[in-house]
């Protein structure tokens, strides 16, 4: 936020902004930052609750403000991340390796809930499920005590049609590579407090991956609905085929390259890059506070677009454009236009950034 305020004040010094215009922008930054700070704190507390069942909070209706600035978010969520920086706080650790394997399994849902560590999900052609765990156990007196603590504080089993791994032990860092039978699943949900989540070639109806501190990266994801949320980290989906995608990060890039019908992404301190490869996409909503936005869509869609930025530039490379509204004030840029209206398939695009540039262009197939 400090950098953004300095930028606004510099524009005042250069005579490009009036004092009142600068005050309006600074108030907006402050207001958005308070909202986002409350959300970060709520998220951190939510994840730490060891007694909490594996549930997902219902998303508020409407389009919430993305908040302002994550240069100072260290005062809230990062402070909690430091609490689980195990190597610094807890000293020596014992390495524990363990494999859970279940023969000839039959389940349709996968859930993983881990306090600290990482998750990598890989489908394979075997009917077994195999979880390879590499853990660091802190505050243990011996190797045997560390192994006992690991097995005591991790749950890994199949109940009904659900396979799950769960550990809320904060003095344990558990890295899991999970091999699952290659088939379509009803649900896959992964929730970490501290650590990255990765996967490839997953085929699922409902997919959810959430972490407070870490990258979310998936290739060849096929899902009817996909949700990805992180406070501090990038979100990357490559070669995906999804119905709806919802992605949100506070500090990090959002990069989506693939096929989807509906996209809703928000970042605070990070760029957004979306490349839609097929013509069945019907809507894109992309919002960031301090980052740039670059959107690429197929050239055989009838487009209705609205682009907004306070301090950044707006541009497009579309054909047959009819400009409905255009505003280019010092603290408010706006474009509303249609394009390629002769085509039968339609797409609606909305993108907004407080300080970044926005560009809409055609994707290369």
From Swiss-Prot:
This is Uncharacterized protein YvlB. Keywords: Coiled coil. The gene is yvlB. InterPro entries: PspC, Toastrack_DUF4097, UCP012569, YvlB_N. Disulfide bonds: none annotated. One of its GO terms (cellular component) is plasma membrane. Pfam families: DUF4097, SHOCT-like_DUF2089-C. The keyword Coiled coil applies. It comes from the Bacteria. The keyword Coiled coil applies. Residues 18-46 form a coiled coil. PANTHER family: LMO2487 PROTEIN, PHAGE SHOCK PROTEIN C.
């Amino acid at each position: 936020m400090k950098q953004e305020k300095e930028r606004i004040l510099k524009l005042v010094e250069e005579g490009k902004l009036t004092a009142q215009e600068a005050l309006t922008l600074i108030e907006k930054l402050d207001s958005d930052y308070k909202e986002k700070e409350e959300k970060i704190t709520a998220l951190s507390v939510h994840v730490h609750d060891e007694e909490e069942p594996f549930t997902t909070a219902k998303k508020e209706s409407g389009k919430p403000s993305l908040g302002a600035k994550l240069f100072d978010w260290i005062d809230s969520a990062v402070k909690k991340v430091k609490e689980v920086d195990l190597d610094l706080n807890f000293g020596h650790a014992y390495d524990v390796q363990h494999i859970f394997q279940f023969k000839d399994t039959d389940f349709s849902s996968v859930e993983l809930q881990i306090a600290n560590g990482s998750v990598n999900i890989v489908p394979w052609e075997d009917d077994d499920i195999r979880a390879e765990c590499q853990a660091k156990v802190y505050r243990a007196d011996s190797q045997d005590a560390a192994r006992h603590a690991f097995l005591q504080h991790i749950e890994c089993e199949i109940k009904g049609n659900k396979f799950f791994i769960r550990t809320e032990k904060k003095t344990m860092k558990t890295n899991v590579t999970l091999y699952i039978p290659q088939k379509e699943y009803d649900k896959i949900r992964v929730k970490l407090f501290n650590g990255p989540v990765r996967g490839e070639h997953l085929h699922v109806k409902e997919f959810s991956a959430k972490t407070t501190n870490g990258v979310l990266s998936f290739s060849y994801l096929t899902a009817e609905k996909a949700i990805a949320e992180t406070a501090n980290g990038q979100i990357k989906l490559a070669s995906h085929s999804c119905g709806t995608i919802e992605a949100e990060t506070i500090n990090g890039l959002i990069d989506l390259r693939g096929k989807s019908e509906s996209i809703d992404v928000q970042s605070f301190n990070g760029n957004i890059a979306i490349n839609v490869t097929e013509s069945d996409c019907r809507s894109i909503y992309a919002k960031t506070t301090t980052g740039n936005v670059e959107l690429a869509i197929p050239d055989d869609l009838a487009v209705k677009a609205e682009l907004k930025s306070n301090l950044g530039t707006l541009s497009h490379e579309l054909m047959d454009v009819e400009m409905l509204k255009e505003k280019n004030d010092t603290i408010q840029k706006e474009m509303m236009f249609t394009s390629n209206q002769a085509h039968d398939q339609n797409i609606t695009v909305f993108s907004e950034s407080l300080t970044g540039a926005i560009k809409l262009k055609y994707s290369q197939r």
